[in-house]
Amino acid sequence: MPENLSSALETFKQQRNAAEAHYLKANRVSVFFREYTAAVETLLAALWAEHFQNSALCLMAVGGFGRGEPYPCSDVDLAVVSPAPLSDGIQEQIARFIQTLWDCKLMPSVKSGSVDELCESVRDDITGDTAFLEARFLFGNRQTADELAEKMNVQRNVAAFIEAKLVEMEHRHAKSQGSGAVLEPNIKSCPGGLRDIHTLLWIAKAQGLAANLPDLLKQRILTRAEAGMLSHGYRRLAHIRIRLHLNAKRAEDRLLFDLQPQVAESMGYQDENRRRQSEELMRVFYRAVKTVKQLGGILTPMLRSRVSSTPMRVTLRIDDDYIQVNNQIAARHTDIFFRRPEHIFKIVEIMQQRNDITALEPQTLRAWWGATRKINRSFYQNSENRRRFAGFFRSGNGLTQTLRFLNLYGVLGRYLPAWEKIVGLLQHDLFHIYPVDDHILAVVRNVRRLALDMHSHELPYASALMQSFEKQDILYLAAFFHDIAKGRGGDHAVQGIADARQFAADHFLTEEESDLLAWLVENHLLMSAVAQKEDIQDPGVLDAFCKRVQTHERLSALYLLTISDIRGTNPKLWNAWRASLLESLFHAAGRCLAGNDGNPHALFGRRRQEAADLLTRAAVPEKQQKKLWNALGSAYFARHQSREILWHAANLVHDFEPPIVRSRILPQSDSFQVMVFMPNGPRLFARLCRIFSRHGFDILAARAFITEHDYILDTFIVQIPSQHAPEDYPDIQSALEAELNSFIHGHTVAETQSCNRRISRRSRYMPIAPSITITPEEDYPDRYSVEITAVNRPFLLADMAEVFFAHNVSLRYAKISTLDERVEDSFTVFSPDLKNPKIQSSLKQALLEQLA
């Protein structure tokens, strides 16, 4: 590199470092962009002079660099423009120039060609056209730059350009769905991200308006409040993106788990707990994108309407205050929301009641939103406002859209201060993937879908139950309040009771409705915990659950709320196995509350009789049946539910020569049920678990049963790896059965091996602290309950079973609850040695070492 260019490169590095240092000290986005742009342009000036002295070409900044928004590691977008087609010599010259840019580590993205060629290249390329919309002259022949800009502007179909950008935005938002996009959002392309702000400005500039917020304010396109809020949201997002690049040392626009604490700390969020640091950063991020989405809902249709051809305007009178314009509702006088604040809820009430109205007319929305910022205690105390708000839930029609609309524009948080505390609050617990407010609204949506016949095919039984449930509005309210006390410290279910009861008292609920609402909020985790962690075949467990529930109404409401809560937490959590657990508990509790199955011996006898009836219908001799029941023992009927007993019996009675392996594909699921019947042996349960883990199966549930004659009957529910299609399941089943048969007949071993499956970034950088509790069971000497919470990983259950074996602890029952990347496992174990505190402590320590 010539000496003069080496000197220019050194100057650039110094200026770039100075720009970063000034930014880190002053924390001003605009100053960083200005100084970094100047540093790049100084270097480009030297390079241009070296390669194109006295040339007819010109150099233009386009895209983000043209906009004057260069991020630390982003591409430098440029265009080399010629008044005439490029000769071979000029093309070689441009290639050398681009190589020099790479040598200087500028990360160039360069378009080159004649004015006509470049115009033609973007005719059907919306991305290229957008880049040139922000073009600005740098060096060379200015006349060529002006000619290009003029031809581009003449060529551009403004209405088509705007529609294309809006379609592009819709596609971008659609790609930003799913847990990864929520937990590790792309700060540029996510809904409400930087690209949405750019889209607004592009739409404005394409129609001849200003391309920056201060000038749009001067042109009265934005109000002062809107310009201020949009500027604030933009600065927040730009700060995060700059810090992302500086910490990652690359053009990383995703808020990855490993980078979140670093970015948070660099932005001044001080906390020794990395998870809390990250949660605070993400809350700032979510609130910023929410502001952008709020303003986008107002400004995008307003800007679009200035140039787009719209269908014929159809206006209908609604009442003295409102008219309907096509599918929108408009206020006759937009100051009505300031003069008569009760109309803040009235217009929403009208929109909820009428299916032919889908939105507020933009100017009405702008005025309405401005008035909502005046919501205060006096507004809350107005009985008309309270009746309307409660009416949103009593009506149910369009409830999800109504609540999401009110949440988007901050009305829920202003009306209910408790709601404001959960907006954007993320939970790094390895199974929640949404901020608390979004999760709650997803749960409301799920409850509401159960009430609609059009969605009955999703969950037919639960839908039928919901559609016959009399107090649907109380269920909607329970969903709305179930997590409202999150983030306060302590038990959110208990703390939420006061919020629910206060709301009920203020919004004209009866005492009976208030009691049901408060009970559901307090106990919303009860059914999930019992079904997933406890042995619901144990009459004592069922009896304790029913004593908490007490009535069929509560049972139905809790069942419906639990289903909706799990489905709204993380799409990965809901599966056929979890559905069957809840349904089994629901039916068992229903029989118990009705006075049936109250006697445990009667229950066990009924289970045995059901199995005997099945075998008799299959023409199995009574002698053969008796042989099976004697081998399994009476305790078998206490530890297994009817469906398992029927399956075991049908498979064992004809081929009762252990060892035996059987499996079946569970209907409408991605899971197998597997049973193994064989003589007991050392570490047998652990070795079986290793076989499943080696095949990539997640163990969803396991029941380890030892007969009176020292045989094991272990039953597993295992989830098939997600990369397999349903048509592959029979082959996978055959392969698994073959390996298990080989193992139980002694032909292969299943020994300890390392874990090859990668642990997710979320588990590595936002882990949860493992916890273990060991509790003696009062009615059963030497029997203990062991509760374990930890990060999920392959071979975890096998490793824990090895620890039990090493400490002379016999595993009698395992209830595995896999919640995405988190496990909450419950074991029933037998060991006289655990009376000794030292041995119990040693067991805990050994388990913790496996969980770490």
UniProtKB/Swiss-Prot annotation:
Biological processes annotated in GO: regulation of nitrogen utilization
Gene3D superfamilies membership: Hypothetical protein af1432, Nucleotidyltransferases domain 2
Family annotation (InterPro entries): ACT-like_dom_sf (IPR045865), ACT_dom (IPR002912), HD/PDEase_dom (IPR003607), HD_domain (IPR006674), NT_sf (IPR043519), PII_UdlTrfase/GS_AdlTrfase (IPR013546), UTase/UR (IPR010043)
Disulfide bridge partners, by residue number: none
Pfam families for this protein: GlnD_UR_UTase, HD
Chain intervals for the UniProt region annotation (Uridylyl-removing): 319-672
EC number: 2.7.7.59, 3.1.4.-
Region entry Uridylyltransferase, spans: 1-318
This protein's UniProt keywords: Hydrolase, Magnesium, Multifunctional enzyme, Nucleotidyltransferase, Repeat, Transferase
Residues covered by the HD domain: 436-558
Function: Modifies, by uridylylation and deuridylylation, the PII regulatory proteins (GlnB and homologs), in response to the nitrogen status of the cell that GlnD senses through the glutamine level. Under low glutamine levels, catalyzes the conversion of the PII proteins and UTP to PII-UMP and PPi, while under higher glutamine levels, GlnD hydrolyzes PII-UMP to PII and UMP (deuridylylation). Thus, controls uridylylation state and activity of the PII proteins, and plays an important role in the regulation of nitrogen assimilation and metabolism.
Record-stated family: Belongs to the GlnD family.
Protein name: Bifunctional uridylyltransferase/uridylyl-removing enzyme
Source organism of this protein record: Neisseria gonorrhoeae (strain NCCP11945)
Gene that produces this protein: glnD
